[in-house]
UniProtKB/Swiss-Prot annotation:
It comes from Vibrio campbellii (strain ATCC BAA-1116). Belongs to the MinC family. Keywords: Cell cycle, Cell division, Septation. Interacts with MinD and FtsZ. One of its GO terms (biological process) is regulation of cell septum assembly. This is Probable septum site-determining protein MinC. NCBIfam families: minC. Gene3D superfamilies: 2.160.20.70, 3.30.70.260. Cell division inhibitor that blocks the formation of polar Z ring septums. Rapidly oscillates between the poles of the cell to destabilize FtsZ filaments that have formed before they mature into polar Z rings. Prevents FtsZ polymerization.
Length: 220
């Protein structure tokens, strides 16, 4: 019995680059810097470009090439103000995208919490699909812990923690000692140099609200 291909709708969490102007060189330099800071996270990552705030025409061909040269995969453009801009982006090979509405399907049934009792070492990746992740040890630099739900680290976080990987906005990251290379919740992320010094090496909880991350220290 042969099976035909099946085309279904789905949703993914993608990084979105919000442009403030049409200076391509500045944008490419910014992306190259991000890749150099966290190459395993950003290299060959799909990228959507939001141009809603850009005044004036954009050289979409140069933009697409620059994004690819920086190590990303240009997926599409959102925020086009009119049909003419859409056509220019489309002619350069960009898909024209629009922000999705709130999902109407029922949320995925959460799986049991995944518990890791040993240190997560450099080069390792741990993923808790459809559930929360608890690490009862340290997460080393160069290691990556990912969960569709929340992440709890009962030790030092020196690597990367990515919660809400399937888009769960209510996900949290809790760790006993924050020294992370990168933290991310539902597609929004901070690199180490974006984490305020008052929270460094502290017990913290990271959450997301109004499309940005929030940090608070914990005393228990």
């Amino acid at each position: 019995m042969t099976h035909s291909p099946d085309l279904k709708g789905s949703s993914f969490t993608l990084s979105v680059l919000h442009l403030s102007d049409n200076e391509i060189a500045k944008t490419v330099e910014f992306l190259q810097e991000k890749v150099s800071q966290a190459p395993s996270f950003f290299a060959s990552a799909p990228l959507v470009i939001n141009i809603a705030k850009v005044e004036g025409d954009i050289d979409f061909t140069a933009l697409k090439q620059g994004i690819a040269d920086a190590g990303f995969i240009p997926v599409g453009v959102t925020g086009c103000k009119d049909k003419r801009v859409q056509n220019l982006a489309s002619e350069a090979g960009f898909a024209i995208m629009s922000a999705s509405k709130s999902p109407t399907q029922a949320p995925a049934k959460m799986a049991p919490t995944k518990i890791v009792r040993t240190p997560v070492r450099s080069g390792q990746q741990i993923y808790a699909k459809d559930g929360d992740l608890v690490v009862l040890a340290h997460v080393s630099a160069g290691a990556e812990v990912i969960a569709d739900g929340s992440i709890h680290i009962h030790g030092t976080l020196r690597g990367r923690a990515i919660a809400g990987a399937s888009g769960q906005q209510e996900a949290r990251i809790i760790c006993h000692d924050l020294q992370a290379e990168l933290v991310s919740i539902a597609g929004d992320y901070w690199l180490s140099d974006q984490i305020e010094s008052e929270y460094w090496q502290k017990k913290v909880m990271i959450s997301k609200a109004e499309e940005s991350l929030h940090l608070e220290t914990l005393t228990i």
